[in-house]
Amino acid sequence: MKYIQTEQQIEVPEGVTVSIKSRIVKVVGPRGTLTKNLKHIDVTFTKVNNQLIKVAVHNGGRKHVAALRTVKSLVDNMITGVTKGYKYKMRYVYAHFPINVNIVEKDGAKFIEVRNFLGDKKIRNVPVRDGVTIEFSTNVKDEIVLSGNSVEDVSQNAADLQQICRVRNKDIRKFLDGIYVSHKGFITEDL
């Protein structure tokens, strides 16, 4: 079944400006700027006023309408990122060999360096994405905090770090060692 026209509305809060030119969305807010290229998705953006943007699909099927909702979610996440920011907390879990995590800089790029995972001599490196800041928690032992404006970059960095510390060829119910996401939230919490 084809839908003649389907619309989604994006509400823009005060202090945030959204500019769209040829399906490249640029969101500017108090925490910074985020840009996303949506040229591959066939949707129509209409700016009603500074506080409301309509996204529409004409003659779209079920998957095309689903892509419309995805576009709305992407822009909503960008708006949340430039107003509140995203913060992921990760904890190191180990039974015997203590995991050693450091931030190193090689050739101008930052890496998260994981040593002594399950007693391995191998050094695991995870590149830090642009716009993601990493700090070690001062009041909680074995915790690392990833924060930034883009939820995609912050969550992908957390996923990369979790994936590089997977236990292979052993029973994962017994060997629970690794670095896991313990908390997902915002940098500036609503009080």
UniProtKB/Swiss-Prot annotation:
PROSITE patterns: RIBOSOMAL_L6_2
Note: Present with 52400 molecules/cell in log phase SD medium.
Any Pfam family matching the protein: Ribosomal_L6
Keyword list, A-Z: Cytoplasm, Ribonucleoprotein, Ribosomal protein
Known role: Component of the ribosome, a large ribonucleoprotein complex responsible for the synthesis of proteins in the cell. The small ribosomal subunit (SSU) binds messenger RNAs (mRNAs) and translates the encoded message by selecting cognate aminoacyl-transfer RNA (tRNA) molecules. The large subunit (LSU) contains the ribosomal catalytic site termed the peptidyl transferase center (PTC), which catalyzes the formation of peptide bonds, thereby polymerizing the amino acids delivered by tRNAs into a polypeptide chain.
Organism: Saccharomyces cerevisiae (strain ATCC 204508 / S288c)
One GO location term (cellular component): cytosolic large ribosomal subunit
MF (Gene Ontology): rRNA binding; structural constituent of ribosome
Assembly and interaction partners: Component of the large ribosomal subunit (LSU). Mature yeast ribosomes consist of a small (40S) and a large (60S) subunit. The 40S small subunit contains 1 molecule of ribosomal RNA (18S rRNA) and 33 different proteins (encoded by 57 genes). The large 60S subunit contains 3 rRNA molecules (25S, 5.8S and 5S rRNA) and 46 different proteins (encoded by 81 genes). uL6 lines the binding pocket for eukaryotic elongation factor 2 (eEF2).
Keyword flag Ribosomal protein: yes
Similarity comment: family membership: Belongs to the universal ribosomal protein uL6 family.
Subcellular location as annotated: Cytoplasm
GO biological process: cytoplasmic translation
Gene assigned in the entry: RPL9A
The protein's name: Large ribosomal subunit protein uL6A
